[in-house]
Each structure stands twice: as structure tokens, then as C-alpha cells.
């Protein structure tokens, strides 16, 4: 019954299994292996922080633009102002941290 199966036998006498060693990438820690992500050769895997800052400012502006609406109560206004302040705080912290070298 088991004669049709072929097993790789290791030098120690047991069946060979997958290695538990981690393969380390030879490049720097910020590079992506082009075998895993082919578009990395064109630079598409890098995060463009300037684009995210512009998107954050657009979100900030959109949240403030929603203050002008057809709602009666001011609870919505406070939520919009709070979320806009949080977005602005995150953007300012990211910009300040990158200029000081705290964030890469």
C-alpha cells in the first residue's frame, strides 16, 4: 500500500520537512524584493508622504466644508470640528516629526 509513495529521507534518518530558518532579504530594510512585488522596480512600492499630506489637507477641508449644511443642531458641527482638528493634529505631528528626523 505505501510502496507507491516516495519519501525524502534526511541524513538523520527522519523525513525531511520544511526549514524553520527565516530567509533575510539582502537589501536595506526599506526596499521591497522585486521577486515578490514586480512593480517595486519602478518605484511604485514607496510611500509618497507628500501625497498623503495633500490628501489629509483635502479631508480637513472637506470636513470643514460640511459645516455648511441643512442641519439644525450643532452636535454635528462639534463632531466635524473635532474630527477636522484630529486630522490636522496628525498631519502637523507627521510633518514636524519628519522634519526633525523622528519619523522616516
Swiss-Prot record:
Chain segments annotated as coiled-coil in the UniProt record: none
InterPro entries referenced in this protein's UniProt entry, alphabetically: DUF2631 (IPR024341)
Cell compartment(s), UniProt: Cell membrane
Membrane topology: Multi-pass membrane protein
Pfam families from the UniProt entry: DUF2631
One Gene Ontology term, aspect cellular component: plasma membrane
Protein name: Uncharacterized protein MT2944.1
Native source organism of the sequence: Mycobacterium tuberculosis (strain CDC 1551 / Oshkosh)
Amino acid at each position: 500500500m505505501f510502496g507507491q509513495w516516495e519519501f525524502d529521507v534526511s541524513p538523520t534518518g527522519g523525513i525531511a520537512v520544511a526549514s524553520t530558518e527565516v530567509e533575510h532579504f539582502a537589501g536595506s530594510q526599506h526596499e521591497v524584493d522585486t521577486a515578490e512585488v514586480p512593480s517595486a522596480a519602478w518605484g511604485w512600492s514607496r510611500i509618497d508622504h507628500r501625497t498623503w499630506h495633500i490628501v489629509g489637507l483635502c479631508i480637513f477641508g472637506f470636513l470643514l466644508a460640511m459645516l455648511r449644511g441643512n442641519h439644525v443642531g450643532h452636535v454635528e458641527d462639534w463632531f466635524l470640528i473635532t474630527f477636522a482638528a484630529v486630522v490636522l493634529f496628525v498631519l502637523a505631528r507627521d510633518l514636524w516629526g519628519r522634519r526633525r528626523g523622528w519619523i522616516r
